[in-house]
């Protein structure tokens, strides 16, 4: 007597029969794969269109025409931009560190794009909290020299690619020097050396921690934090910078308290 046996196979789940968690997982995986493919295709299209950045290594900013007396005292200048160029080794460490504390604390650690900063900015945006921006010094150099400020995905992607390219071609010190000599700081002053003269009437090397903090607060919004036109907003921004400088170990407790109490003499 023989027994008839039937093949019993596992039922195939249709999409409608799949549990919700599995559907979500498939959708997320598909979305991630599509996003990655789109990103790679965008990079392949945009990278050949990036501008030549080799000239940055030999950067020479345009200088205004200056008029001096016979004994070397400047009595005037011509040009829309006021600027003094300083090589990296002549920019005081205090000024460099003050700027990095508020603009890009991980500058010497990231490759041009700070993913930790990006994630921090996303979290802050989701929780409606204010934080420092996610753009690095290198990204700001890329934007200042080569790009517009239009807020499009393609422009942001170009900025990221340019930042990686610049980091590959230049040293960190070269990039920081470019930024500190080129950035606009209000009152027609470009670069920190010129800003020190414009706002305080002294060379960059003579600035106190309080004065360095005032200048370091300008790149974010030079019109809003201009110490001549908006002394109260400039003071508030300076206090934020001093707090960052103290938190990053740029200044100690005594210097922090002294800088907060210092009354600055700003040129009118």
Model-derived features: where do they sit?
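Flexible, acidic/glycine-enriched loop-and-adjacent beta/alpha segments
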Residues: 87-137, 193-194, 200
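Short, solvent-exposed loop/turn elements at domain surfaces
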Residues: 74-77, 107-109, 224
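Terminal hydrophobic membrane-targeting helix
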Residues: 46-98
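N-terminal type II signal-anchor transmembrane helix
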Residues: 1-68, 106, 126
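Short, glycine-/polar-rich solvent-exposed loops and beta-turns at beta-strand/coil boundaries
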Residues: 58-59, 78-79, 111-117, 134-135, ...
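Residue-level signature of transmembrane alpha-helical entry/exit and packing/kink sites
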Residues: 23-27, 93, 155
